[in-house]
């Protein structure tokens, strides 16, 4: 790996977390930050804990072009769009369907956005009482496999950027069934956003002691999407092929796009790929054991309906 020159900086907490909490679900404004990081940089807090490590232009155009079609599917296949991330995308209004009897459903949904997950997910109750592979792996296994080089490169750079955090995350990997880990990486899951600016949020289900990783695809003419970290009053401008390692448990959000030329996702496009370790997957049984539990539960349900 080529040696890089970094801007190193120490930042101090200036905005209390309970104050930022009030901004949850709201997009940031320019007055929320004092400066923008626009190159290789290492940012630490007053206790020398890494907040953000930016690597400019990690991937070649060839690597990005090869992986683009697989990531683009998260927009082109609307099965991967989400209508339950209203707060994440900053939506206030919810859409209420009209029932067959003509009444309005009380349960509202948000406008669907091109934001989807892939990889592995823990049991969360409701329809998902067991850990699972996401739909993307089942529907597009070849495309998923084509992304492995990207994930492994990011994992390798994580080891270089924040080795102590990488070691902690890999220790968590060892405590997790290999059925729920992206092979050869410190990650379990990815989120792919296509032209979706995130509102203020925290990723509290990620491994707090580890680090998240984000890479970005950019094309066309537009401005905005800077990643704002309000507690420390700075923002990061991610360019095409950049990689960012960051603490996902701190408050963060994207500026809204502006001055875009042409049609979204056709003439201009921004894809962010976030890789992370979902901490609750450490508690989950291997895939085969989980499947046996599903079969047992279905059998018990069937027997119950025939008593």
Regions found by a protein language model. Name each.
Residues 1-210, 236, 258-307:
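Fe(II)/2-oxoglutarate oxygenase catalytic core
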Residues 189-198, 215, 222-226, 249-255:
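Conserved short secondary-structure elements within globular domains
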Residues 205-222:
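Short, conserved beta-strand element in jelly-roll/cupin
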Residues 211-213, 225, 242, 271:
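Residue-level detector of short, conserved catalytic/binding motifs and their immediate flanks
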Residues 215, 236-251:
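Conserved metal-binding segment of the jelly-roll/cupin
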Residues 217, 229, 243-246, 256, ...:
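Ordered, helix-dominated protein-protein interaction surfaces in large eukaryotic regulatory proteins
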Residues 217-239:
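A short beta-strand-loop-beta hairpin characteristic of the jelly-roll/cupin
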Residues 224-227, 238, 247, 255-256, ...:
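Intrinsically disordered, low-complexity regions enriched in proline, serine, glycine
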